[in-house]
């Protein structure tokens, strides 16, 4: 008789809790996000920034066709990590909800309303049979009265952040944000910080495999940065990265000298 792991029964159905209170399928959906490309968001006094790593696996792929930051409305954007097809379904739903709100109330939808709608859908996919949890997390950013930034989890939970990262480089990026984030940052400083965090999680950062978008307080309009703009910011960031690496090496050598 084949050995059956004790958690097997709870693995097969998303609606059944394990004895220790876990939903295994939700945990597996989170694992899909953890294996995904890194996406970061940074809020500042002038607006909000989203930046993502584009994992282009072949030189034959057109980089412009590989989209990881999506416009939801004029004033709302989303960045994804995890299963891209799942993220696309969530993005399309967010776009629909934003347009329904405009038609119903004659005003732009508050970001918090759209986030709640998306997370309600995610939560439903953890509770009913015949479906599975979405294997994607979204960072949702926007400007209504002020800049806002949310992280949405596969479980349906959501949190507001000043700076946040999802995907495989989350831990590294979050450590950088903890160290370098300031509430009074300008938009340019926020862009640099977002690209800096991404660059530290990537082997070969370049303008081709980084995508950046901003929404400013001034015009409340979504805009993607051009390749030339990203190259400019990345050049400045890489100088900072190199300077930090030199300082770290100097500290390592000074510690070594102290042992003699």
Swiss-Prot record:
Function: Component of the proteasome core, a large protease complex with broad specificity involved in protein degradation.
Gene Ontology MF terms: threonine-type endopeptidase activity
InterPro entries: Ntn_hydrolases_N, Proteasome_alpha, Proteasome_alpha-type, Proteasome_asu_arc, Proteasome_asu_N, Proteasome_sua/b
Top-level taxon in the UniProt lineage: Archaea
Keywords attached to this entry: Cytoplasm, Proteasome
Gene3D superfamilies (UniProt xref): Glutamine Phosphoribosylpyrophosphate, subunit 1, domain 1 (3.60.20.10)
Compartment(s) where it occurs, according to its Swiss-Prot or TrEMBL record: Cytoplasm
UniProt cross-references to SUPFAM superfamilies, sorted A to Z: N-terminal nucleophile aminohydrolases (Ntn hydrolases)
Any GO CC annotation of this UniProt entry: proteasome core complex, alpha-subunit complex
Regulation acting on activity, per entry: The formation of the proteasomal ATPase PAN-20S proteasome complex, via the docking of the C-termini of PAN into the intersubunit pockets in the alpha-rings, triggers opening of the gate for substrate entry. Interconversion between the open-gate and close-gate conformations leads to a dynamic regulation of the 20S proteasome proteolysis activity.
Protein name: Proteasome subunit alpha
Oligomer status and interactors: The 20S proteasome core is composed of 14 alpha and 14 beta subunits that assemble into four stacked heptameric rings, resulting in a barrel-shaped structure. The two inner rings, each composed of seven catalytic beta subunits, are sandwiched by two outer rings, each composed of seven alpha subunits. The catalytic chamber with the active sites is on the inside of the barrel. Has a gated structure, the ends of the cylinder being occluded by the N-termini of the alpha-subunits. Is capped at one or both ends by the proteasome regulatory ATPase, PAN.
GO BP terms in the entry: proteasomal protein catabolic process; ubiquitin-dependent protein catabolic process
Protein family (similarity comment): Belongs to the peptidase T1A family.
PANTHER family cross-referenced by the UniProt entry: PROTEASOME SUBUNIT ALPHA/BETA (PTHR11599)
């Amino acid at each position: 008789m084949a050995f059956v792991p004790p958690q097997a029964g709870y693995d097969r159905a998303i609606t059944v809790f394990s004895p220790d209170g876990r939903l295994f399928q939700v945990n597996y959906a989170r694992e899909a996000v953890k294996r995904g490309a890194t996406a970061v968001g940074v809020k500042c006094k002038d607006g909000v920034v989203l930046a993502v790593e584009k994992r282009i696996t072949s030189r034959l792929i057109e980089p412009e066709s590989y989209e990881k930051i999506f416009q939801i409305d004029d004033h709302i954007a989303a960045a994804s990590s995890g299963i891209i097809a799942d993220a696309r379904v969530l993005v399309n739903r967010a776009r629909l909800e934003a347009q329904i709100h405009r038609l119903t109330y004659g005003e732009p939808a508050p970001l918090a309303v759209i986030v709640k709608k998306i997370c309600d859908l995610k939560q439903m996919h953890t509770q009913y049979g015949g479906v599975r949890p979405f294997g994607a997390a979204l960072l949702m950013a926007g400007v209504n009265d002020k800049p806002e930034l949310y992280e949405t989890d596969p479980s349906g939970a959501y949190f507001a952040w000043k700076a946040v990262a999802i995907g495989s480089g989350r831990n590294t990026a979050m450590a950088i944000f903890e160290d370098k984030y300031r509430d009074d940052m300008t938009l340019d400083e926020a862009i640099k910080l977002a690209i800096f965090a991404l660059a530290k999680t990537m082997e070969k950062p370049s303008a081709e495999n980084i995508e950046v978008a901003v929404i400013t307080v001034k015009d409340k309009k979504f805009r993607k940065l051009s390749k030339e703009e990203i190259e400019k910011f990345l050049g400045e960031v890489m100088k900072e990265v190199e300077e930090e690496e030199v300082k770290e090496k100097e500290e390592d050598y000074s510690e070594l000298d102290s042992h003699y």
